[in-house]
């Protein structure tokens, strides 16, 4: 079966590098699904889960906090602002971050503080959604 080279990197480290049959991720205009031979594309990505289906059918999940996606016919590169392997996501920390961001929204004094709190809330909410999605796919409740 045809595969595509996938690299997911953040400013800190390379998170994933390998061959895949399929990649799904949250693009700026909606969910994107990428197969080998996909039309070249460059777009921004939103915070959320990147799902990588490997050659042997196993799935790898990576949470990204936004970034840039580059697609070439034989390669997919995700340049993430921040990336966390699915197995390393911490639901308790994400929930605390969501609560802090909601509190900050209530207590903002300037437009900049409000925008920062909104971005933090979107990040925490996307991380919690990725955790729930991963748990559902693994059959955990």
Curated annotation (Swiss-Prot):
Instruction: Supply one GO molecular-function term.
Output: proton-transporting ATP synthase activity, rotational mechanism
Q: Which Gene3D superfamilies match?
A: ATP synthase delta/epsilon subunit, C-terminal domain, F0F1 ATP synthase delta/epsilon subunit, N-terminal
Q: Write out the GO cellular component annotations.
A: plasma membrane; proton-transporting ATP synthase complex
List the keywords (alphabetical). Answer: ATP synthesis, Cell inner membrane, Cell membrane, CF(1), Hydrogen ion transport, Ion transport, Membrane, Transport
Q: Which Pfam families match?
A: ATP-synt_DE (PF00401), ATP-synt_DE_N (PF02823)
Q: How does it sit in the membrane?
A: Peripheral membrane protein
Q: Its quaternary structure?
A: F-type ATPases have 2 components, CF(1) - the catalytic core - and CF(0) - the membrane proton channel. CF(1) has five subunits: alpha(3), beta(3), gamma(1), delta(1), epsilon(1). CF(0) has three main subunits: a, b and c.
What is the stated purpose of this protein? Produces ATP from ADP in the presence of a proton gradient across the membrane.
Q: What is this protein called?
A: ATP synthase epsilon chain
* UniProt source species: Paraburkholderia phymatum (strain DSM 17167 / CIP 108236 / LMG 21445 / STM815)
Whichever gene encodes this chain, its name is: atpC
